[in-house]
Amino acid sequence: VHLTDAEKAAVTGLWGKVKVDEYGGEALGRLLVVYPWTQRFFEHFGDLSNADAIMHNPKVLAHGKKVLSSFGDGLNHLDNLKGTFAQLSELHCDKLHVDPENFRLLGNVLVVVLARHFHEEFTPDVQAAFQKVVTGVANALAHKYH
């Protein structure tokens, strides 16, 4: 992902304020609600019967935190996202058989969650920078599929 110095500063500056444990569960929960076909990968998480059940499901919240923590780790390696996410790409491709489109969807949902929490700070320029990053992460996670 090619980011200008200003974009890197915007992304890392805002990320320092992200409540990973809270926003991760919200992002994954929203993915499962908005795109219900993604639930098939999480059937072992228990009750996913409606939005309220999903958004309060402890396994969804815990996995969302894990996903967002991994995303945050990627921000430390913006120049090598493919290498950073190589093992996760292999896992999701070879073992879990996740449709790589889901990575793009989750990235877009994450942008929505950030906009929801950061209002005025989440300017169009900040959104554009984050959109580059989530696209780069999605591409890195889909790399094994190519």
Curated annotation (Swiss-Prot):
SUPFAM superfamilies: Globin-like. Red blood cells. Keywords: Acetylation, Heme, Iron, Metal-binding, Oxygen transport, Phosphoprotein, S-nitrosylation, Transport. One of its GO terms (biological process) is hydrogen peroxide catabolic process. The modification N6-acetyllysine is found at residues 59, 82, 144. GO terms for molecular function: haptoglobin binding; heme binding; hemoglobin alpha binding; metal ion binding; organic acid binding; oxygen binding; oxygen carrier activity; peroxidase activity. The modification S-nitrosocysteine is found at residue 93. InterPro entries: Globin, Globin-like_sf, Globin/Proto, Hemoglobin_b, Hemoglobin_oxygen_transport. GO terms for cellular component: blood microparticle; haptoglobin-hemoglobin complex; hemoglobin complex. Signal peptide: none annotated. The modification Phosphothreonine is found at residue 12. Involved in oxygen transport from the lung to the various peripheral tissues. Belongs to the globin family. This is Hemoglobin subunit beta.
